[in-house]
Each structure stands twice: as structure tokens, then as C-alpha cells.
Amino acid sequence: MELATAAQMKEIDRRAMEGGIPGLALMERAARAMADQAEEMAREIAAPLDAHHLSVFGMPDGEKKPQRRAMVFCGPGNNGGDGFACARLLLQRGWEVRTFTVTGFAPRTEDAQEMARQLQDAGGTVEELAPTDPKQISFCLSCHVLVDALFGVGLKRPLGWEMLAAVSMMNGAGVPALAADIPSGIETDTGRVLGGAVNADCTVTFTLPKIGLFVGEGGVRAGKVRVADIGVPRACWQEEKFPIQTVEPGKLPRRPRDIYKGKCGKVYILGGAIGLTGAPVLAGEGALRSGAGLVTLAVPARVYPIVAGRCMEAMATPLGSDPRAVLAQAEESSVALLGPGLGGENRMKRMVLTLLENLEKPVVLDADGLNAVSGHIDVLKGRKALTILTPHDGEFKRLGGDLSEGTRLQAALSFAAETGCILVLKGFRTITAFPDGRAFVNVSGNPGMATGGSGDVLGGMVASLLGQGLPPEWAVPLAVYLHGRAGDLAAEELGEYGMLPRDLIQKIPYAMKELE
């Protein structure tokens, strides 16, 4: 999916209205999408509760199910207008609705004022929020859904104390929250929290998804993201460029019937140290399970028997002391993965630098391979062949990456542009950044993957897809997606607490089969 900035959305809305679509019409459609989502959320809550009530108490003849309740928090701008319209629609659908504005933040735009009038004409009321009022608190706690329509994509400055009190009321209620366009308090372009932000269970975003819904704290606070078509013609954004996107995997290419192992990619993996022998094995299995034809595990001689004893399909080989021989062996591969379980020995670090300086093949750097180039960034800048780095935040900082502003997306893009490398910044919503300014945000994966060895599997998968000849702009984000999807399949079967990287490995073929 293409992810939009606040400026782009402002321009797209302007074009739509200049093209003859009234702002009130857009607002009405946005509100309808919000009301539909509120109904769905209420059904999800009420169904198990109603079933339990009936099983225990039964339903007296003629008695109706309890009326559904919503508390709608409206801000001063057009996001608030969406809220007023949503409140009216829910009221007309039989909900008990109370709508609130924050002291000093009455509706200011013409469209928001009109929607507030329409709500009142329909029998609704607009009240001033008093977050410490026991009656308001009691109503809030009794609701099926809280609707956040305080601020939308235009927010640029931290929330003031009045708005923070409203946000705190929503977050502390324990009631499902539905956000209009973006959770209030989230910066649209970065996902940063501006003073405080709503913890939404679901966000209905309009026309196009926004960057801040998928990166930074916004990726956590947005909950499930639903994109609503509110009637803005595609022509209003077809000339726009969207360098930031979520990963859309597409279909895998069909393999020719006469293909053989040498044509399916040769992956060379350098790693393994005492106490870290599992890392290259996991990387090798990740490469094989994602389609590599041949995998070589080059490990120090003293751990060779351990690694060789754990390999069936991969070929283990002991490293010699001559860097030229290691280089010659690596040159026979399609791609090299340097670092899984490599350890911190200076000899191994020098070997990594030697390969980077002389190997004319794509290189994936992970784990201790990344630590080896810390302080030697010029080696990366000097490479002519493709280089992919796969750090987590700690490794990224050791490489010189700047996360001080808390904007992982911008930090990843800056580093990729500076070094000429593809950067896979691992973590929640892994970011794959390219030197030309494009970035892909991954939405697959789950907390069960937060265990040692998962990153080794990913490194093997990235190397595998590159070795099979997929173009880098597809291979790298696709590997990240498949890694997360395999983790999701493992979690569905085993749960998030007990799954291991080898469980993830077993699910890679199933994740890939979904794309065949």
C-alpha cells in the first residue's frame, strides 16, 4: 500500500473539492465508514457477552438487548466534523450517544460547525467534557465504543493539557477506541507521539493510509487499520509519488521445469564461533527453506565437527587461514551472508573486511558481520557490488545510525542514502530502506519472533532470494515479509510464547506457497 504524508493528503482533498466534491459529502462518507466500524466493534464485544448472559439468566419475554452506547470526542477541526457526523449516524441507528468537545476547542471550521448542527437537529447534544465528572466517567466506562475525533492528520504540535486529559480518559477506560483517520496525538509523517496519544483498537483512515499509522509509536497506537474509500477519485493522487509503502508481496515467479540446483542460487554463509554454532545452521536452513539450491556454511575449523553434524542439506566447510582461499570460495557463490554467530575475534573481523573490499558479489551483513564494519563505514561506501545490512536498533547505533529523534524511518533512509546500501532495520514494523529514498514497511510478524536466532533465519532468506535472481527491490522486502508470515503461521499453531526459530523455518514453505 502507498503511504501518504499530511501534505499529500491536504493536496488530495483540495483537488477533490476543486473537482466538485463538497467537503460535507466527504465528511458524511467518512462518518459512515466510522459508524459501520463502530457497529462491527460493538458486535464483537456484545456477542460473547450476550451468549453468556443468555446461558446463565435467559432472556425474559419481550425484553430487548441492552442499547449500545458510544462516547464521541470531537476536536475543533474537520476531524471533529467527522466525529459529529458519526455521532448522528449512530444515534439514527438506535445507539445511545453522547458527544463531547474539549473546553476551549469548540468546532471552528464551517463544515465541522454544520455537522454539529445536524447532530443537534437529529436530537443529539454536544456537551463540554469534564474528565473528572463522575457521571461522565460512569457513562464512558459503560460504552461499547469510544470514538476519537479530536485531531487528524494536520496535528503538528504537542497536545495541550486539556486534550491530554481527554486522551487520558479514553486510554484509561478499558473500552475499545475507534480513531478517525489517525489516533489523536500521532504525527502523520513520522508516527511520533506529540505529548500523548490515543491507544486505538482500530483506526479508520480515509482515502489513503498514512505513514504514521505504520511506523514509530503510531504503528502500535493505531490498532487495526481500515482504509475507507470516501469517494475521492484516483485522479486526485495519480501524479503523486509515494516512496514509502507497505510490503505487498505479489506472486512468486514460476520455476522453469528444466531448472537445476546450480540455477536456484548458491549461498555462502560465513559464521560460527564457540557457543554460537546454531546461528549459521539456522541461517542455512532459512536459505534452503526459501528456495536456495546450494548452501555452504564456512565455519572455523574448531567448530566444524559441531556444525557439520547438524547439517543435512547444507554443506559445511572448515575455514582456512588464507584469506585468498576464503575469497576464492566465496566468489563461487551467487551471494554471501557474513556474520551469523561469527563472534568477536579480530581474525574473523579482518576476514569480513577483506571480503567486503574484494568480493564482487552481493553481500548480506548480519549480527557480528555488522559489528565488524563498525568504524569502517567507508568500506561499505566503496563497494561496487550490492550490499544489504540487517541490523536491529542496537547494531544500527553501533554502525553510526542516529535514532536520537525516535524516527526510525528517517534514520534508515538517511543511512541508506549515505552508504549506498540497502538497510533492513529490524524490529516492530521492520523497515527496508533503499539509497534512492524508497522504503518498505513490513506488517507481518508477531512478538513470538522476539527470540535469539530469528534474525539469522531472516539473513538466510534475504541471501536466498537474492541468489535466486530476484531483483533487490523485490527480493529484500519479500524476504522480510515471508519471514514475518512464517512467524505468523507458527504462532497460529503454537502460540507466541513457546515458538522457536526452527518452528518459523518449518513454516517458510507454507508462507511461500501462499504466493505461488
Regions from the PLM with identified roles:
Residues K65, A87-N171, P305-T317, R324-E332:
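N-terminal small/polar loop signature for handling phosphorylated ligands or for N-terminal nucleophile
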Residues H144-V145, L150-E240:
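Internal gly/pro-rich beta-alpha loop/helix module
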Residues M1-V102, T109, C202, L213-V363, ...:
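Small-residue (G/A/S/T)-rich helix-start motifs and N-terminal tracts that mark the onset
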Residues P131-P134, S184-T188, I211, D322-P323, ...:
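Short acidic loop-to-helix transition motifs that present clustered carboxylates
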Residues D111, P158-L159, G191-R192, G400-S404:
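Short, solvent-exposed loop/turn segments at secondary-structure boundaries
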